């Protein structure tokens, strides 16, 4: 009889232990589920950064992102049609890739404009089955033109088209890419370069991208070349369209870092060190072409672009071990506002912990301790001066990209910036690093703020900067078929 009682008691204890484990797990699983279709303006929770509270869902009468559009009238100065296709294509170096093209090539065609030009792009989806969009990475366009599926528009279905119109705001090096299933479509080749500037004799555009493990410059593996006469001041516009930081630089002559993320560097000096270019970031390198030429190196000497007079063989070799540090490069200059008088002070703490995301077990990214979609929505009003501290204890680096704005770096790991104002739209935040940035909220809308290692964004490392009173008629997931990451 005692044995029977002991067995019963043992079963009850085992059942209790099992329930004690399964019930919390079931709760965590259930609360991790992302709604089949949701409004991105209503996800997460409102973070007002110490400023006045605003109704997270409906403040005042509300303004739709559709109202925040580019010019509806006027003859465009730049008028192009871009056609997206899912297809097999050949790289410039001959390898066959099964991916995505724009007008039959990848990278897609260069879009060139001048400051103040009205740009009109008619985007046609010929055969990208999941739909596609065009996002203008680094160009602070009006919100409706931002090209984010489910936030500022619906993804363009096969057979559909969408027209983007915006004024080219500032000279610089930028790029366009799909922001629908971007972790797949950008990787597969749905992107291209944009330059806002008049063409110059020494200009070289170098878009770096990895296709199926093959890293390329302008779609070419190995060594390419660009003919530029000796004595010409060359401006090499480098675009990192991959998901990880890459060291780049010129060898064969000293060079200057003259622009970062489409913003001029004040007082650039000659360097020979490599430049660490974040995923999604751009850098303009300037040098006078020597008689023997020079070479852009991307990562290692296995991928390079010789730049020099026809017939010259530019010097080869790897980049030096030291790197340009923008925290102290160049000379100070006014930034146009006072970060010490911030209206909002935000924290963006990036971490990682085990759990469930949309019912899937794993090790997931967190923002301020919360997993997507229960992440902070950074709430601002137009005209606010905003400070944000971005810290990273996740174990991996993250290239953080804020849409619609450029921010200035104030400090890294508590050390104040002393060089040129370091303006960014894409900032590499390494593990155990902390950056302070500041910007003016001067472009109303609903703006993504996410990691541009795009698989990380698809795993939940994304949120939004949300302006008072702005709503969106678009939805993400479910029957909307919008999946921005």
Predicted segment positions?
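Flexible loop/turn segments at secondary-structure boundaries
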Residues: 214, 244-246, 256, 266, ...
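Primarily extracytoplasmic ectodomains and periplasmic/lumenal surface modules that are beta-strand-rich
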Residues: 87-91, 117-120, 127-131, 174, ...
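Beta-strand signatures of extracellular beta-sandwich domains
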Residues: 133-137, 247-249, 399-401
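Active/binding-pocket-proximal capping segment
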Residues: 253-261, 368, 393-422, 454-458, ...
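N-terminal, post-signal-peptide metal-ligating segments of extracellular/periplasmic oxidoreductases
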Residues: 2-161, 196-234, 333-386, 468-469, ...
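Divalent metal-coordination and catalytic microenvironments
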Residues: 82, 121, 134, 178, ...
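Histidine- and aromatic-rich segments of cupredoxin/plastocyanin-like copper-binding domains
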Residues: 2-3, 145-148, 154-157, 167, ...
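Extracellular/periplasmic metallocenter environments
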Residues: 126-128, 141, 150-203, 243, ...
